[in-house]
Regions:
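Catalytic metal-binding/acid-base residues of hydrolase active sites
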Residues: 56
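Structured mid-to-C-terminal alpha-helical surface segments
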Residues: 1-49, 59-67, 71-281
Length: 281
């Protein structure tokens, strides 16, 4: 989208934020991530990047239903090194689009080993002076996608058009979230994991193939060494339901995000239990 000046862009952002009941900062962040994603889709690396995580979930269910601040991707066809990623992102930043935005790579660092997948974190800036928005892109490799990635049609925030990008299929998104919730048990401090499972299943559950989801979950737990959750999930869910800490974290989350305010912690637990009972029967 071309705008006359940065003030006009800010006005568009403010209106969209009011319409979707989320902060203008979140809308700006998502707009700039979208601008980066379009550059990836027009780059020679279009078929090497696979979109996953919060930004994909937001695209599936709607920005007013799930917001995120960063971009998660997995890459194929490349060895994951700082040098390779810097070169790739420098080229992506140099893709010219008529949207007034210029990107720059600020830094490259390793993702902590404690995260689900080790990988590389790319810090960037999206500039439309005087607007400057810091962005983070996480890049992993070797992710288990079952059965395979799909071509996802991504609708743009302000333009009446779409871009095409490779992405996780729905079953793999759900499998990773289920594994995270169950394997971390009461040690999980991220209410959004519960929300993601609940909202994805509520809005897209009918499109989810149960056999594929089970296989995706089995392969994810195999990769992460957490296969015990497949048999122990009833006991794990009992512990989760009885955790005062998790309930308080959920209550805080549902107060902070308008889209979660009418969903209870029990609702999310019931959804997880329903999915697990259905696929493990």
């Amino acid at each position: 989208m071309m705008t006359k000046n940065p003030m006009q862009l800010k006005a568009f952002i403010k209106n969209k934020a009011a319409e979707k009941h989320i902060s203008a900062q979140l809308v700006m962040q998502n707009y700039m991530l979208e601008r980066l994603l379009e550059r990836i889709s027009l780059s020679p690396y279009k078929n090497n990047f696979i979109l996953k995580g919060g930004f994909l979930i937001s695209a599936i269910v709607g920005l007013d239903t799930r917001a995120t601040m960063d971009l998660d991707t997995t890459i194929k066809g490349f060895t994951l090194t700082h040098e390779a990623i810097r070169k790739i992102f420098t080229e992506i930043c140099n893709v010219q689009i008529a949207d007034d935005v210029q990107f720059e790579v600020v830094g490259i660092s390793d993702i902590r080993e404690t995260d689900d997948y080790p990988g590389i974190r790319v810090a960037l800036k999206a500039n439309y002076p005087p607007i400057s928005v810091p962005l983070t892109v996480d890049v992993t490799t070797g992710d288990m996608i079952t059965p395979r990635e799909v071509e996802y049609t991504f609708s743009l925030l302000f333009d009446d058009r779409t871009i095409s990008i490779l992405a996780y299929n729905l079953e793999t998104v759900l499998a990773e979230k289920l594994e995270t919730v169950l394997s971390r048990n009461i040690a999980n401090t991220r209410p959004r994991d519960y929300y993601d499972v609940h909202i994805l299943y509520a809005l897209r559950g009918a499109e989810c193939d149960k056999a594929t989801l089970r296989r995706a979950l089995e392969r994810t737990t195999q990769k992460r060494g957490s296969g015990v959750i497949l048999t122990d999930y009833p006991e794990i869910m009992k512990e989760i339901r009885e955790s005062d800490t998790l309930r308080k974290l959920w209550e805080k989350y549902s107060r902070e995000y308008e889209y979660a305010k009418d969903i209870s912690f029990d609702d999310t637990c019931n959804t997880i239990q329903t999915i697990m009972d259905a696929i493990m029967a």
